[in-house]
Amino acid sequence: MTIKSMTEYETISYKTFLDIFSPLPEIGEILEESESVEEAREKLFEFCKELEWEIRMGRIKFDNEVDRWLALKAIEVFLNIISKDNERLAGFSTLEYLWKAYKGDEEALKEIREGFIEEFRHLFLAMSGKADYSLGFLGKRLLEEGVKFIDFSKIKGREAGIARSNFLDKVYEIMREYISRYPSGLDKRIILKRKKNREILEEFFGITDEEWFNYKWQFKNVLRGLKGVKILRELREVTNFKISDEDLEIIEKAVKNGIPFGLTPYYLHLFDFENPYVEDLAVRRQVIPPEWYVEKMIEHKEDRNIAFDFMGEHDTSPIDLVTRRYVTIAIIKPYESCPQICVYCQRNWMVQDFDAKAFPGWEKVEKALDWFAEHDSMIEILITGGDPFSLSDKAIEKMLNRIAEMNHVVGVRFGTRTIVTAPMRITDELAELLGSFEKSLMISTHVESCYEITPEVAEAVKKLRTNNIYIYNQHVFHRYVSRRFENVALRIALKKVGIIPYYTFYPKGKMEHKDYLVPIARLAQEVKEEARLLPGSFRTDEPIFNVPRMGKNHLRAWQDRELIAIKPNGSRVYLMHPWEKGIYPTKLYTYEDVPIKEYLDSLKEIGENIEEYKTIWYYY
Ligand SMILES: *Cc1c(COP(=O)(O)O)cnc(C)c1O
């Protein structure tokens, strides 16, 4: 499951490079005849303006109005990329690479990767109106299935209504085929598999159902440290549970180097014991760290809390345990670990092992609560961590009682993943305690795939909802949950158990998480080509980019970001607009994305047909 490092790709041939200009040979000619980058810049600007005007005057014919719109967008992107001012912001010149490479400069050609070539191949196709984007991937599938597109200007009334309805049923057939690739934990087959796994584990641990369904037993028996590795080894020896030597060694290396690893027995039973990394790909990747991650974390063992504090939390904490980035809400972190550790955790620089030391002590917690009491701007308090449901009911009650006295606080939100990692934590007592809180109380949880949604999750959610507590989901759209319609399958499963999709996060570009990254373009594509096929009440999540220090911002479109450069390795460079835009002056944030080509290669490795993703290049 390792991703090829970029240096392993071969140097691009000059001919391959020249080929990309075939939709717009004029661009190649300008690069050829220009004596300098500056000359090329001026001439390309003139050319683009003329091309734009020809389009706007209707002198260029397009197969479809959408392809015409895309051509205008692509011209804008190209102008952005060749703009001198954007070069200043990006810190380098994309145009210089294009110009040098066109002149056959070997150094430039050596540096340029396939990802760069592909970006420009598609950009030039789009600018010339030949992208065929309007058909999308679904349109192509429909044509393959022999479905005829109906011209609704030719038929009317009931006839049109029936034709459209029949056509939409065909669309659903394709959608259903994709969704069915992702088994849900509510499927009978999976429920039976898990029942068997539970029995195997109960026998292995020498316990009864009663202990299994008791969260205290689950918490006490979290697989962690060297003991956890030993248990996984033993389990492999005496049961049908499969795990590779490689995985065991990586986990062992992680725990020996103080990198937190934690896995609840409950979550372990979600694994497919006999077929690793097929149906349970996302579940295993949730907790088993890839080698690269472990290496990077070891490299930065000493300065981890600086190197990996990607969100700049050190600079947004007015007092210990509190993080404030917004006007009316701040975070309090009363427990700095979780029963289960997510490999891609953005707080990986601070999470500790799951034990008593992760509780900072009442003195600190009370001081942090005092801070909330003193700030009447705080209308909501987000209690997270770590996982606050690691704390006892008593501790939770104590915090809530204190917050109940703060008149300005309207609501409390808990950020917890126990609903997924140890759903038995949601006892009747806890649900009633939370339900008895007189202010608004909600929970945001973190379900990554429909495979994690089980009858146990459904029961935990039901207990909370009968106590008037709403549960929202924060989904991290990482590489192993980002396939076609995978997020759609998740949204449907969430809806079945009563969890409301809230955020779909772009997995931030933290280098130790390289194997989990997904380009922004894939999120944008998912929203448009997949989520859009669901009813509005199912697609309530917003795509979000977390701007370091500043806070979360939407990833909707050009009102939130601008593509300003393409690195020779194919990474897009964006200017991200923070949420404060239009509220007070603030700096934009320059961000380098993961190359689309690298992402597509990794999808191919997990068996995807990347032809089905090819419109991704047209999401800027
Ligand atoms: C995410 C986050 C919140 C909550 O933001 P919402 O948009 O209300 O979900 C609050 N404070 C901090 C520091 C956060 O990172």
UniProtKB/Swiss-Prot annotation:
InterPro entries: Aldolase_TIM, Lys_aminomutase/Glu_NH3_mut, rSAM. The keyword Glycoprotein does not apply. Binds 1 [4Fe-4S] cluster. The cluster is coordinated with 3 cysteines and an exchangeable S-adenosyl-L-methionine. Its cofactor is [4Fe-4S] cluster; pyridoxal 5'-phosphate. The modification N6-(pyridoxal phosphate)lysine is found at residue 552. Gene3D superfamilies: 6.10.140.1170, Aldolase class I. Belongs to the radical SAM superfamily. KamA family. This is Uncharacterized KamA family protein MJ0634. It comes from Methanocaldococcus jannaschii (strain ATCC 43067 / DSM 2661 / JAL-1 / JCM 10045 / NBRC 100440).
